[in-house]
Amino acid sequence: MTTKEFLTIIQKEANQIDYERYLKQLVYKKVSSDNKIAIFEVNNKYIASWIKSKFTNLIQHCFEIYDGSKPTIEIKLSNEKKSKKEILKEQTQNESTESTILNPSYTFDSFVVGPSNQMAYNASLAVANKPGIQYNPLFIYGGTGLGKTHLLQAVGNHAIEKGNTVIYVTIEQFMNDFTFSIKNKNMEHFRNKYRKCDVLLIDDIQFLSGKEQTQEEFFHTFNELHNAKKQIVMTSDRLPSQIAGLVDRLKSRFEWGLTADVQIPGLETKIAIIEKKSELNGICLSREIINFIATNLDNSIREIEGVLIRINASASLLNQEITLPMVQGLLKEQIKETKENVKLPDIINIVANQLNIKPSDIKSKKRTATVANARRIVIYLVRELTHNSMPDIAKFLGMKDHSAISHNIKKANELIEKDENFKLIIENLKNKIINSRE
């Protein structure tokens, strides 16, 4: 069977959207000598992973239709070596594959929504449903690893399903395309590509800073798309007004539509993210483990994803059961780093602010129920989140000896076991303290 014959069969058998987005990129390479393994190649790792997880049975079915065989399907990443001449030809004659390929797992369904990202999510869904109608441009900003790219690509995936033409690039790719087109005197191709789409998605727009010639080109691209009521969505790590080296006319245009921020997730959202990511990756975690990860890690979703990969790899490669001690061992160094960065005065300030008392009250001789409770929480969190010894804590809080510290830690542990409200207060404060290091 040739690639052409295979594509003819699978186009008839597959959903048309799946065929256009993923399956038509398959290149049939060979079948093993015993006819048991059929090997295909594709030039994008996300597409390869998606096809492996979703379409191997369908591909097998195509072989059954063709000759009655049912080989095992292997999907490999293409590593063909091409001459510089061939690469240049592809770049000038074809649409950039990188600019249109989206990670198929980045959808609205797989995005965990919480108070920290609700507005950005709602706005993204609105523009994906009706591109160019409202919130144009949509400017999503926030810290690294909080889900901006996920939302951006979810807009693209959703818009494609509705029949729109979508271009997705990082601003670096846009700049590289622009430079390449000038060098090869092919600006017509460049402008047709970026100005004729229904939806333009630009990641990390802040890196346009200081690039005067590219800013000029992007200004005209923006105007043409906006005037034609085509949707523009951008992400950045800061507001347009805060991007140094960006011309004022672009700053003002970036704020024509809606700016929506993605904030650090709260504890509940972080727990939901861990639950969702572990479910999608087939990792079974107990509530105890999920809470441990949520309260001890920084807030980057990428870091959470990395930890889940490590847990899964350790469990499968070492044939280990996923238990709390196992996860604690894996995260030991990351938690150690957290402890080195958290300072005792910061804990006092955050607890006092949360419980509406003065920081000085916690270090005072006051024994009211509110102050005593706040002091107990501080002592517990200092032991949990720092390397301070009990004598150090007693000295800092002006207490006579460390036996009172030990008593408060014991009491806090008892309350965590019995009182759900106290436990939630502790978890929320722990999360706030870790967040404060950002």
UniProtKB/Swiss-Prot annotation:
Q: Where is the signal peptide?
A: none
The answer on whether this UniProt entry bears the keyword Cytoplasm reads: yes
Which cellular components does GO assign to this protein? cytoplasm; plasma membrane
- An MF annotation (GO) of this entry: ATP binding
Q: Does the keyword Transmembrane helix apply?
A: no
Map out region (Domain I, interacts with DnaA modulators) in residue numbers: 1-71
In this chain, the stretch annotated as Domain IV, binds dsDNA covers 316-438
Q: Which family does it belong to?
A: Belongs to the DnaA family.
| Matches recorded under HAMAP family | DnaA_bact (MF_00377)
Oligomeric state and interaction partners are given as:
Oligomerizes as a right-handed, spiral filament on DNA at oriC.
Instruction: Write out the function statement from the record.
Output: Plays an essential role in the initiation and regulation of chromosomal replication. ATP-DnaA binds to the origin of replication (oriC) to initiate formation of the DNA replication initiation complex once per cell cycle. Binds the DnaA box (a 9 base pair repeat at the origin) and separates the double-stranded (ds)DNA. Forms a right-handed helical filament on oriC DNA; dsDNA binds to the exterior of the filament while single-stranded (ss)DNA is stabiized in the filament's interior.
Q: What does the comment on domains in this protein's record state?
A: Domain I is involved in oligomerization and binding regulators, domain II is flexibile and of varying length in different bacteria, domain III forms the AAA+ region, while domain IV binds dsDNA.
Tell me what this protein is called: Chromosomal replication initiator protein DnaA
Q: Which organism is it from?
A: Aliarcobacter butzleri (strain RM4018) (Arcobacter butzleri)
